[in-house]
């Protein structure tokens, strides 16, 4: 009991009333404070407020369901002392630990002591972490002023803006170029020959009346440019394929 000197308020839980007054006086002398009494069989019906006692002493008792209740009844850093307990010390120590007590120890073959943590059950505390680096936080901030926008017009050259000539898109499946191979079977040779004949006929086409470029209203019935839009004098015009073939 020497370790309990200076504790102001204690609770003595008893089972045998024999020499009860003597044991209470010994506890008062050891603590120097007030001592309240409670029978072990009436403990579950008691209505003690939380954090009421600095020390709870139990003699000749084995409590299996009341250790949590005793934990609430003790003040923060309060002590629980079991004397002449019933049962193996190892089992009691494990049960007390699982109820929330700390620093559980066996003082002697017939005495155990445990403590309540230095804070109230259900209390909270502010965690003190290192201060955040303001520069580290700003790394993840996106500012519109810092964005470098790319001019869409700079992505394309003048050559990219020009539409490709559909006539020059098809290539030979063998050579990969717009030039027919020797044994062409994909039809590119015939297509190139037709374009060649069309170009030659266009170059040889001449106007007998001199009014072909003005449009159909000024063209004769056999004009090779019949049905085509008007064009400038001297402008190179490609005739349609059906005008290069015989009607017979």
UniProtKB/Swiss-Prot annotation:
Localization terms from the record: Cytoplasm; Mitochondrion intermembrane space
Motif (Cx2C motif 2): 220-223
Region Fe-S binding site A, annotated ranges: 172-186
Residues annotated to bind [2Fe-2S] cluster: 172, 181, 184, 186
Pfam families listed in its UniProt record: Anamorsin_N (PF20922), CIAPIN1 (PF05093)
Keywords attached to this entry: 2Fe-2S, 4Fe-4S, Cytoplasm, Iron, Iron-sulfur, Metal-binding, Mitochondrion
Location of region: N-terminal SAM-like domain: 4-129
Coiled-coil features, chain-numbered ranges: none
Family classification: Belongs to the anamorsin family.
Its job: Component of the cytosolic iron-sulfur (Fe-S) protein assembly (CIA) machinery. Required for the maturation of extramitochondrial Fe-S proteins. Part of an electron transfer chain functioning in an early step of cytosolic Fe-S biogenesis, facilitating the de novo assembly of a [4Fe-4S] cluster on the cytosolic Fe-S scaffold complex. Electrons are transferred from NADPH via a FAD- and FMN-containing diflavin oxidoreductase.
Annotated protein name in UniProt: Anamorsin homolog
Annotated source species: Drosophila simulans
